[in-house]
Amino acid sequence: MQTIEQQITNVIEKSLTDMGFELVLIKFKGVNHKVVEILIDSLNGEKISVADCTKASSTISAILDVEDLIEDAYSLEVASSGLERPLVKFENYNRFLGREVKVKLKELLNGKTRYQGKIIKAENNKVYLKCEAQEVLIDYDLIKNANLVLTEEVLKKLLGSVKVSN
């Protein structure tokens, strides 16, 4: 049986993709899980705007109203996945090659459950990280969660793309 998050993914993902968005994560939060938070990113690498979130929210809300998957009253929040976005699909690691990532594992690997390093490659269900002076090979199935890290390099690129008007 599918979780409610998987059921919601099944009914909204294609519409979001058609709109140019990637569905990053669905989670329930708040008291009694009455808030449905949906994180999105753009498929073309553009920044997500408030208008994008509003447009996605309207579409998702309409779909969820028709599908009636959530029994009780809830609030819907649609937001950008952010600069330190979670990596929740194996394909995300290839999309963000060369980027710094923090990874938390389900069990020990070389005596550690946490790693931080640059993504070197991702293939055959394995993620290769450059952590300080060593390479670490992590089986994707061992990853509990992972997030991009906002580094000085990324920040400089972002600030370099900001146009300042006088």
From Swiss-Prot:
Origin superkingdom: Bacteria
Major localization listed first in the record, in broad terms: cytoplasm
Xref: InterPro entries: Ribosome_maturation_RimP (IPR003728), RimP_C (IPR028998), RimP_C_sf (IPR036847), RimP_N (IPR028989), RimP_N_sf (IPR035956)
A GO cellular component annotation in the UniProt record: cytosol
BP terms from Gene Ontology: ribosomal small subunit assembly; translation
Keywords noted in UniProt: Cytoplasm, Ribosome biogenesis
Keyword Transmembrane in record: no
Subcellular localization: Cytoplasm
Primary role: Required for maturation of 30S ribosomal subunits.
NCBIfam families (UniProt xref): PRK00092.4-3
PANTHER family registered for this protein in UniProt: RIBOSOME MATURATION FACTOR RIMP
Family to which the UniProt record says this protein belongs: Belongs to the RimP family.
Protein name: Ribosome maturation factor RimP
Organism: Rickettsia akari (strain Hartford)
